[in-house]
Amino acid sequence: KSDGENTTSNNVAVFDANKVLTDTRTRNENELSDSNSIQYSINYTNRLNATGKKLTIDLQYSKSDQDQASSIFQNNVFVENNNTIQNSVRKLFQIDYVYPKEDGSQIELGYRANLDKSNSDYKNIPLVPYSDPKFDPSNNLDFEQNVYALYAQYGKKYDKLSYLLGLRTELTDQKIELLTTNENYNKSYIGLFPTVNLGYEFNDTESITFGYSKRLRRPRSYFLNPFESRSSETNIFKGNVGLDPTYT
């Protein structure tokens, strides 16, 4: 459990077309936050025999809740209240099998499932009307993302030369529900991620390694939320539900 208090200040200077200062504004935000989190983990390891065969199973469950309340003042005038309630549940299941062979090589096989679910409920209460009467940043977002991965790798060492070859396939199933507007967005995609490592030992203190791998970075729910959020009149952020993952 953790509690916190934070104050931020944003200063805006407005100039006309001739670069003459016409107005200044100061926006102060006082934020109070309260969060709770809990996590449970279970690990099972079975060394199947003396040759190094091993089976490992991991289970994990975590839950977190956060409540943030903000009071915003502009030029020392109380203009709005914001309240954000966020909660998330994460589940993990992973199984790995290691099989060393008599020729010195080793095979590893595994499966991993990450199941994430979260909700973000943001309420905005303006005390001074916005210049745009249609603007309402209040929103409620459900986000669910399940990632299932199968992977295998094979490695061997010949005297001073060693290599490792691996391949992982991932299925991502993503669901976004905008409860405020009753909109739903679903996306599923599969990716293949190879890994190649080559190593050579010159002596006991010097070696060289070449490696290649492919990785995936998925956008967080914050960057997918299409509702506007403003830290000032001129600083506006809006997510995009159509964002694709990036590969490196």
Set out the residue ranges of the language-model regions.
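Face-selective signature of the C-terminal outer-membrane beta-barrel domain
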Residues: K1-D3, E29-E177
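Outer-membrane beta-barrel translocator domains and adjoining extracellular loop/strand segments
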Residues: E5-L21, D67-N76, S120-V128, K175-N182, ...
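Outer-membrane beta-barrel signature, preferentially recognizing the C-terminal barrel domain
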Residues: N139-N146, L216-T248
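A surface-exposed, glycine/aromatic-enriched loop/edge motif typical of exported proteins
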Residues: E5, T45-R47, I208, L216-R218
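Membrane-spanning beta-strands of outer-membrane beta-barrel proteins
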Residues: S37, S88-R90, V147, Y189-G191, ...
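Active/binding-pocket-proximal capping segment
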Residues: L167-T172, N184, S213-P219, F227-S229
